[in-house]
């Protein structure tokens, strides 16, 4: 069944109810918002939008971290993973929130310390805190991608 949602980047749009992700604990700093939709801007784009279904002004640019940091593996316990019904990181869709500074998009950063993991079967999601202290909340995406390409 299709429902209409209001989005920050695209205005009104129709999405399938099956596109709605449930975050029982919300996202860090936004614990009151539990329902989100993952929206693709364009099919070719690596960036997606994680849009709150409950609050139009709450939307995050997200990207799979493997696109610019191939060896990224956050430290998350099996017990934490079981909270969304998965047993291994590979069983979920992993995303990180991207911050794009208006003055210079080339300086965009990703929150590698707080990855989002989504159970692809149940659409349950959670934002975790990686216990790997080498992960930054402001990892420069283009700098990391350039190093990965060397």
From Swiss-Prot:
Q: Which keywords are on file for this protein?
A: Bacterial flagellum biogenesis, Chaperone, Cytoplasm, Translation regulation
Which protein, by its recorded name, is this? Flagellar assembly factor FliW
> Which family is it part of?
Belongs to the FliW family.
Q: What does this protein do?
A: Acts as an anti-CsrA protein, binds CsrA and prevents it from repressing translation of its target genes, one of which is flagellin. Binds to flagellin and participates in the assembly of the flagellum.
List the record's Gene Ontology CC terms alphabetically.
cytoplasm
Lineage here is: Bacteria, Pseudomonadati, Spirochaetota, Spirochaetia, Leptospirales
Main location class: cytoplasm
Enumerate the Pfam families for this protein: FliW
Gene Ontology annotations of biological process type: bacterial-type flagellum assembly; regulation of translation
What PANTHER family does the record point to?
Answer: FLAGELLAR ASSEMBLY FACTOR FLIW (PTHR39190:SF1)
């Amino acid at each position: 069944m299709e429902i209409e949602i209001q989005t920050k980047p695209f205005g009104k749009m129709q999405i399938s109810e099956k596109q709605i992700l449930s975050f029982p604990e919300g996202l860090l700093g936004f614990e009151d918002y539990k329902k989100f939709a993952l929206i693709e801007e364009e099919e070719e784009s690596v960036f997606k939008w994680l849009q709150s279904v409950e609050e139009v002004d709450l939307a995050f640019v997200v990207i799979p971290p493997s696109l610019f940091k191939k060896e990224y593996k956050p430290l998350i316990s099996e017990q934490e993973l079981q909270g969304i019904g998965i047993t291994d990181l590979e069983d979920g869709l992993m995303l990180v929130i991207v911050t794009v500074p208006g003055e210079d998009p080339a300086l965009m950063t990703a929150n590698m310390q707080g990855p989002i993991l989504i159970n692809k079967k149940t659409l349950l999601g959670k934002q975790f805190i990686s216990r790997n202290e080498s992960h930054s909340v402001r990892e420069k995406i283009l700098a990391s991608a350039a190093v990965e390409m060397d």
